Amino acid sequence: SNSVLKLLLCIIEIDYSFWGGKLAGKLDYYRKYSKDLIATISISSANGTTSQKLNNAEMLNSGIELEVGSQLDIIGKDIQWYGNVNYAYNLNRIERLFVTDNSAKTYLRGDFKEGENASTIYAWHYAGVNKDGIPCVEEGSSPDGLRPMNTVYDNTSDATGWLRPQGVKVAPHIMGLTTGFKVYNFDLSLIVTGKFGHKFKRSSFNYPTMGKTGTSKIWVHKDVSKLLDGDKAMPPLLTDTEDSNQMYYDSYYTDAMDYLYHNANHIRFQELNLTWHIPEVWLQKIGFRTAAVYGQINNLGLITANKYKNDPEFPEGTVKPERSFIVGVKFNF
């Protein structure tokens, strides 16, 4: 073995073609083991800090990439159909990472964890109110397993198992489809993409500190109606008293609750294009070699898997791509 090798890579590729090329494509399998990746690891406090970003992590990446393409003559070369599908799947896992700090903050900020996917999401689970009427989350260091949400969570103990894994934020399954018809001098094409197997965090009521700080702002969100209706799936508002410590609500808990994470599967209709290629006999009279008139629509629509109909890639409060229309002419002399 090579002790200084930083990357172990295995790639298997299969190219195929059937029925005279009417169905063709390729299948790739890869398995990559990477060493000396940059990550935050634990070091001796004698260095003046207990953690440092160093080249000391190891990760396994494996997956497949599939391409399938076809072109069929329906009526000779005058009417044709074509299509191409691309699919990619990736699985990664942190194989080696030396850390001694597994406190709650490391899970909430997305630090790598040995044995887990690099993009695993962790969140608090709301456990209802305690006997004093204070909303609580599950936390292992408390005697009853509950942490009141108006107190700071234990950030010194090992928090393994406290926060629940919600899935991954990077889609492991990605698909793309390009298909179209050629009908005499007209071309009609469609581009569709899809991402599957991951989660996204939707926006919600932000539990502000009710104006007690200069930066406190209330987000006018429809979820506030659930609070007013007493929805037990969400933490209620704390009573506005001096000892309620409302600042802990939005600072430590309510922005990282498991009920905020939802299925991010979606299919996006990216582009529809119609092109008319002007007949050559017409072009010869005006001295053009080729010319075409086209119309295109971008961002046609979206199919989502979450009940809120949120766009997983452009959550509420961000700028979403608007549907656009393009008409143009292209030609060669």
Regions found by a protein language model. Name each.
Residues 54, 71-169, 200, 209, ...:
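Conserved small-residue
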